[in-house]
Amino acid sequence: MGMRMMFTMILLVVLVTTVVSFTLDRVLGPVSDGRNAAPDDEKFDRMEYFLSKCCANPSTCDLSLLCIFG
């Protein structure tokens, strides 16, 4: 693999990581406010709902589903 291809792959991984992180933040909200606060049950209920739908029908498990919760 050439240097350009490796650089492109690294950029792709960074982009995907950023998109997934941003999308999950929209779904769950910030997981912590920096003070080790107790988690908000509503946020985890939404994630549990998403995972149950995703596990029930894996063909619908993509990033576009995450956007409906935002």
Curated annotation (Swiss-Prot):
Expressed by the venom duct. Its main location: secreted. The modification Phenylalanine amide is found at F69. One of its GO terms (cellular component) is extracellular region. Pfam families: Toxin_8. It is found in: Secreted. The cysteine framework is I (CC-C-C). Alpha5/5 pattern. Belongs to the conotoxin A superfamily. This is Conotoxin Pl171. It comes from Conus planorbis. The lineage of its organism: Eukaryota, Metazoa, Spiralia, Lophotrochozoa, Mollusca.
